[in-house]
Amino acid sequence: LEQIEGENRYATPEEQQILSQYVGWGGLADAFDESKSNWSAEYHQLKELLSPEEYRMARESTLNAHYTSPVIIRQMYETLEKMGFSKGNVLEPSMGIGNFFGMMPDSMKESRLYGVELDSITGRIAKQLYPQADVQIKGFEKTDYPNDFFDVAIGNVPFGQYKVADKQYDKNNF
């Protein structure tokens, strides 16, 4: 990823194939724990390879970086088709590397794609995999999308006891 970005270009199809295999940090919490001696090599390698900000974001994402099964994604799109959706502005609000974009059926390919991803590495991979999409790497609450802009929001956002500040909606205590 760093080489591709350093050369200021988009990934080739072969590089996209490699990048698409990235599954996030969700299963690697032990690799971020200095006290886990059997993960010591991985811990030190991550500290060496990632910038301090990348490391912090990757470590924070270990609790919620789990990707959705293709079976579930296909079913969600089948449901959208049955509801009559064929094209429009599509939002993936917690996109990971964009598996929902990648599995979008041909019948919806004329849609305009918008994605948001909090983790820097994951979001940068998504940008390489879907250069035609508008991918923002930040918390969704920090985006400036207008209300009523999206025709469909699809994805599998993290579940948990998270509360974020959003000036527009804080008064409702969402």
Question: For the regions a protein language model found, what residue spans apply to each?
Answer:
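Class I S-adenosyl-L-methionine
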Residues: L1-L129
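SAM-dependent methyltransferase catalytic-core segment centered on the flexible catalytic loop
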Residues: S94-F174
